[in-house]
């Protein structure tokens, strides 16, 4: 069992939860980033820094993740590529990406990108608080249990 993290955009609290689960359940964590990020000092965690470039970390994850593994990412187009490949994908707020919701998630992402570019909406997501952490922990637990059963 392996969990991949799109580490550039993943909140520290979510990364910490993943490592805690990994230590308890004995699975590998691979953090992929386009720049150096803090890596927890445990042997089960690897950090891969890819050459900077548009979607370089995403491309690396898609190329190396396989069905039966989980990727933690906020990037909807990345999640779409993973789901099409049969790889489980979860955002740090506890929302799983799957074939049933991918179309809606992509449409919403594209709409908000367009509105942001037109200056009609600002900023990004709301703060990452206790509610988000709990939703993420619950979803992570559920998906890891499902993937571990094979």
Curated annotation (Swiss-Prot):
CDD domains: PIN_YqxD-like. Pfam families: DUF188. InterPro entries: UPF0178. NCBIfam families: PRK00124.1. Belongs to the UPF0178 family. This is UPF0178 protein PP_5221. It comes from Pseudomonas putida (strain ATCC 47054 / DSM 6125 / CFBP 8728 / NCIMB 11950 / KT2440).
């Amino acid at each position: 069992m392996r969990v991949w993290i799109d580490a550039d955009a993943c909140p520290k609290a979510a990364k910490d939860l993943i490592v805690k689960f990994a230590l308890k359940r004995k699975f590998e964590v691979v953090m992929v980033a386009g720049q150096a990020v803090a890596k927890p000092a445990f042997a089960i965690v690897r950090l891969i820094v890819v050459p900077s470039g548009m979607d370089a970390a995403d491309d690396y994850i898609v190329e190396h993740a396989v069905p039966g593994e989980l990727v933690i990412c906020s990037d909807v187009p990345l999640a779409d590529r993973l789901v099409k490949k049969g790889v489980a994908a979860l955002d740090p707020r506890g929302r799983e990406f799957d074939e049933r919701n991918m179309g809606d998630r992509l449409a919403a992402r594209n709409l908000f990108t367009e509105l942001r570019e037109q200056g009609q909406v600002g900023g990004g997501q709301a703060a990452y608080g206790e509610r988000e952490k709990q939703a993420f922990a619950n979803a992570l637990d559920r998906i890891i249990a499902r993937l571990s059963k094979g």
